[in-house]
Amino acid sequence: MNTTGYDILRNPFLNKGTAFSEAERQQLGLTGTLPSQIQTIEEQAEQAYKQFQAKSPLLEKRIFLMNLFNENVTLFYHLMDQHVSEFMPIVYDPVVAESIEQYNEIYTNPQNAAFLSVDRPEDVENALKNAAAGRDIKLVVVTDAEGILGMGDWGVNGVDIAVGKLMVYTAAAGIDPATVLPVSIDAGTNNKELLHNPLYLGNKHERIAGEQYLEFIDKFVTAEQNLFPESLLHWEDFGRSNAQVILDKYKESIATFNDDIQGTGMIVLAGIFGALNISKQKLVDQKFVTFGAGTAGMGIVNQIFSELKQAGLSDDEARNHFYLVDKQGLLFDDTEGLTAAQKPFTRSRKEFVNPEQLINLETIVKELHPTVLIGTSTQPGTFTETIVKSMAENTERPIIFPLSNPTKLAEATAEDLIKWTGGKALVATGIPAADVDYKGVTYKIGQGNNALIYPGLGFGLVASTAKLLTQETISAAIHALGGLVDTDEPGAAVLPPVSNLTDFSQKIAEITAQSVVNQGLNREKIVDPKQAVQDAKWSAEY
């Protein structure tokens, strides 16, 4: 460690603040720069938590935590380890949405993020190098913020989602925060509010698209792999026209993962397996209506489709289990404006007596009798009492997942779903939901939050030095999470609670690493995948 004095106190990866020992203060040129009392990290955490508690509202609490991160990374994670359930919705979803909306007004140091401008493609590699600052980067989370949190295009403000995502990676799975890098791709924005905001910090022009955009993405991937050849590249909140295209282009050549396409599909399928474990039913016997056929909705469909094929169904048999509903109603093969992801799962009008009437969700549910209803529409309140009761009339344990977030965009509340179905519904929500007490039973509500699965998956890939992420590995991680449900408990949640996040993230990481090694996709020799995960785990201690 050649850095001394105030340079150390300004470096969040090195700074221990008042916890520096007397010997360290002498050695590092810190004598006289700190109060004389030497604190333990536990004392610092107690002090910081009291400061956190004094903040209100939640956005102020988030700003406090971000400033703490910028000052002392180890203390930040030590504190988060102690309060993971409380901090998760503040560091990440849903409070991060407020942070993104007000990013320009509350701007703080950007947590060591790299900002790449489409207007300066020649600077891409240098920008990544500067942001890494000599650190050995193993995980990159990148966003262009075209599809932030179901909120749409938020330009450079969306960097906060990459920052929050990486904080969850470390808090949940133990990846070393010095080895991660959030990246913002500033391709412009089509958000008029931002373009007219004099404080907006991004490029003040409309988004670039097409060939110019994809060339920039390719330049970024090339530079990222050149600088960090053993890293996992995680794509976050890209728009529906680009997300699948980008994933398809790179997934066969590098270790890469799109959380909105793959992660959302993984967590929903894990929740479905949890529900089916409770109801004692089989995946192949379900009929799925997906309300919202964008990036997230189609990611869910494709993940379930892959699992149905693994269960022995042909492509056509597996596709026949799905009904896609978007703003046009039920999607048919002649519907205008279909995306490439939607086309394989559309229906023929010839299948129905009254196809022209299948334009609203109420009619569709009444006519088709789905057993599983998944919402990624960002249309609040659309899972009405009539629709939900219709489902409950035709299936013993309807699986209903209103996943849109933040809170104001949810299709229904967990409490309503439980009461409208007489306690029959198996529910997961996209936001944290309180327990529901109904007729003497306490129903615990699983949160369909990708944070339940991507930290363990990503850490397992990093720890095993994975070359690629395959469907086999994805399936292994899904089954690991879906098998954690307590089927003997009345009102059991279909997904495990965030309070147990570190425990099951460890299990998912170990199973992921084992899958990588089983397929021979590890770069470095690994004899014991479980030990490799343990050896790579970082702990928030000085």
Curated annotation (Swiss-Prot):
GO terms for molecular function: carboxy-lyase activity; malic enzyme activity; malolactic enzyme activity; manganese ion binding; NAD binding; oxidoreductase activity, acting on the CH-OH group of donors, NAD or NADP as acceptor. PROSITE patterns: MALIC_ENZYMES. It is an enzyme of class 4 (lyase). Gene3D superfamilies: Malic enzyme, N-terminal domain, NAD(P)-binding Rossmann-like Domain. Its EC number is 4.1.1.101. PANTHER family: MALIC ENZYME-RELATED, NAD-DEPENDENT MALIC ENZYME, MITOCHONDRIAL. Its cofactor is Mn(2+); NAD(+). Optimum pH is 4.35. Mn(2+) binds at residues 236-237, 260. Belongs to the malic enzymes family. NAD(+) binds at residues 293-296, 405, 450. Signal peptide: none annotated. The keyword Thylakoid does not apply. GO terms for biological process: malate metabolic process; malolactic fermentation. Keywords: Lyase, Manganese, Metal-binding, NAD. This is Malolactic enzyme. Involved in the malolactic fermentation (MLF) of wine, which results in a natural decrease in acidity and favorable changes in wine flavors. Catalyzes the decarboxylation of L-malate to L-lactate. One of its GO terms (cellular component) is cytosol. SMART domains: malic (SM01274), Malic_M (SM00919). Oxamate, fructose-1,6-diphosphate and L-lactate act as non-competitive inhibitors, whereas succinate, citrate and tartrate isomers produce a competitive inhibition. It comes from Leuconostoc mesenteroides. It catalyses: (S)-malate + H(+) = (S)-lactate + CO2. Homodimer.
